[in-house]
Each structure stands twice: as structure tokens, then as C-alpha cells.
Amino acid sequence: MQDGYILYFDSGTTNTRAYLLNADLEVCHVIRRGIGSKDSAISGSNKVLVDCLCDMYQRMLEENHLSGDSIKRIYASGMVTSPYGLHEVPHLTVPLDIRKFAESLYRFHESSGIGRDIWLIPGLKTDRDDFSFAGNMRGEEIEIIGAMDELKKLGIHDAALVLPGSHTHIAYVKNDTVADIVSNFTGELFHALKSETVLAPVMDCVPEALDEDMIRLGADNCRRFGFNRAIYICHAMRIMNKYLPEQRFAYCEGVVNGGLGQILEYYLRNIWSDCKTVVLISDEFMYKLLSVIVSETCGELVRDVIWLRADRQTSYSVGGLKRIINVTGEKQ
């Protein structure tokens, strides 16, 4: 193996991935662990996460027959920059172009195990007088930078990027600049309803296909009646034995995610009026779900809905890191 490697940690709330990139910035090895900032928060210390990163570092060296000197630089993104991460780093403020972002990485010396400098990639936030428009992210920013390169290949330079997750973030990007962010509760809300409410039997369903009409009904009821009433209707469906289990499930998804359509419609109509393209960065399930909601709520405002597949085999975070390295010219 050729020397001149880069190690990149992508650490979230519940999982951490370590990527080994060669001198040509090609991924040659990946290690995954089910530990993230949540484990640090629960324990009251970041030691569990630091130990995880140190262990992954040693494993990466051993499994690839490398010495520490073979790793020329280490980067980390995501929740490692949060209070329960590796080291808290303040968010950068949008609008921010890729060059300024790449020049704003935070150099941190990890002394307890790895014993090296790690370049931490900050999150992003908005800064407006009206706090109702607040948005912030940690980890999604580097995915956005990676996705922007993919969109360039499609001739797209101006789009609203939707990144579903525990918190679904929508970022408006234009000409290599992250211009705005709007952040929302979604996946975490779904989990709470599934684990802590009487809707658990409805949401435990695993349908073979999503019923698009029921998604639309859920989203429409959320718009007409508000979340509280719309989600109760799903409970009533089960009590009164109305509709099939998979239809109730699709309805629930429409309610939980229907607000995203309303939020996106508001921003496209009132704030991002030049934007005519929506990009869904997700797995196939979320693409099918959100494409129905976007078409239903934003149809007259959107010209194209684009899908960028994101799964275990596709990492836009790695693509974002490559872009940062190429911008700064610091491979070594």
C-alpha cells in the first residue's frame, strides 16, 4: 500500500464511520461502530466516544498494515464538534461559500489516545433577527458540499436540498454557496410516537409499498387541521378498524412529514423565490415518501424533483471532504 493516507471520521448521534482514503482520495477501507454523541450524553462524558475513535484509529492501522506515520492528516465531522463530541466547535454562519468554509476548519490536538491533530469540520447555522427562522446542523453540511458536486454534473447550481433524518434539514444552495438552512423535527418525532404513544401498533407496520393516496391524505389533514388533530385521526382509524394497516402507516408518515411540505412551500414562495429545484438526498423509502409530499404541496413552485441516493454504499460526506481538500490543496 502507498503512503500518504487520510483518515476521516464521520460521527453522528448514534453511529461513527471511519474512512481511509489513499493519496488519490479514493476510499480503500471503511470501519463502522454503533457509538455516537448520544452515548457520551448518556454517560455524562465524551470518554466513550474518544475511546471509540481511538480504537477505530488503531484498527484502521492494523487492518491495513500501516504505521501512524502513513496517515498524513485526520479529519472529523458531525457531532464530534458538539458539546458531547470530541471538542465543541462553534457553528459557522450562512451564507457561506465552499472556499470560506474549507478555510475555517478547526485544528484540535487529541492527546488521550490518538495523540495527533485532528481537523474538525464545523457545523452551520443561520443568524437572523427573527428567531423563528433559526436553523443549524452538524454533519449535514459536509454532505451538502459533496452533493453540490454531484448536482453540478447535472447542470444544477440552484436548489433546495432536503436531508431526512432524526432532524430533517433543508438547505438552499446557490453557486457554491450554502445560502440558508431550515431545520425540523421528523425522524425523532416518528420514533417518539412509535415508542411512547398508542400509535405504536400502527407505526410498527412494515409495508411492501407506500400508499400514495394515504400519504396525501395525511399531509392534507396536517395542513387543514394541524398536527394534533391529524395524528389523532390515525388513532381513530385503528380503533374503528378503518383502512388496512399499511394504509394507516402511510397516513401517519404523511402527517409526520407533511409539515415539511408546508415549510418548503413557505420558503420557496416567500424567501427562496428563485429556487425551482428540490433535491432529495435519501434512501429509496424516503424519496418515495417525500416526493409525494413535495409534489402535493409545492407542485406549482417546483420545476424538478431530483433524487440523490444516500445509503451505506454512497457517502456524500466523503465527497464533501474531497471537495474541501481540493479547495485548500492540503492532501498531505
Roles of regions detected by a PLM:
Residues 9-15, 79, 162-167, 186, ...:
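A short acidic Gly-Thr/Ser loop motif
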Residues 6-48:
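Short glycine-rich, Thr/Ser-proximal phosphate-binding strand/loop in the N-terminal lobe
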Residues 36-44, 125-160, 164-224:
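Glycine-rich phosphate-binding loop plus the immediately following alpha-helix
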Residues 54-73, 261-274:
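Phosphate/pyrophosphate-binding loops at sites that engage ATP/ADP/AMP, CoA/4′-phosphopantetheine
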Residues 255, 259, 306-332:
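Glycine-rich phosphate-binding/hydrolytic loop that grips phosphoryl groups
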Residues 63-108, 114, 119-134:
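Short beta-strand-loop/turn "lid" adjacent to the catalytic site in phosphate-handling enzymes
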Residues 220-263:
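Adenine-nucleotide phosphate-binding core of ATP-dependent small-molecule kinases
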Residues 15, 274-293:
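Glycine-rich phosphate-binding loops at beta-strand->alpha-helix junctions
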